[in-house]
Amino acid sequence: INGVQLTLKKADNVVNKVSVSADKDAIYDKIKEFVEGYNKIVKSMQDKVKEKAFRSYEPLTDTERKALSETEVKLWDEKAKSGLLNSDNTVSNILSNVRSGLYEKVEGAGSLFELGITTGTYQNGAVLQIDEKKLKNAIAKDPQKVLDTLFKSPDDIKDHPKNSAEGKAQRANTGVFVRVMEDMSNGITAIAKQSGVGNESSILQQVKG
């Protein structure tokens, strides 16, 4: 459960006892899996900002669609949808905010970079890199601290304004991965509603999934 393995042991004439030991390999694998999924989303967003736009390809009308073959419609739609988020300030701001959020320390736990998880060069944007040795050492030393730093969730979550004192306190008590994914999900949902992309946006589905 969350990288913690429960082991039941029974000695002669002794009632069963439950010993809880951290499954360190499972914790590492969970973190690695999350980082890989997160990086995939970030790279998709970065690609969308740089994607070429074909301004001459306007959305087809119903009449125009009927005059074209299924293949022609598909190719036209791909061109029309390409570059919708090219140089989009909102997406760029989301990526910038996510990168900044990665540096924020978690109250009562630690910071992402103490665990050997970094963003590398600025050109890499918010893409994460793992120092395997440093992360495994951190897990071996204090697995609960690692889990809290990344996945901690406040006991009583409220919908406070982000910049209010309550909102800042709640954010400070939320694990880095949890709050970053919340920021990404909220930002992409806002873009989808604003641009009319809808809930079928591929990036939005990746975040929600």
Residue ranges, per PLM feature:
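Acidic, low-complexity proline/glycine-rich segments
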Residues: 1-14
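Type III/flagellar export substrates
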Residues: 11, 15-209
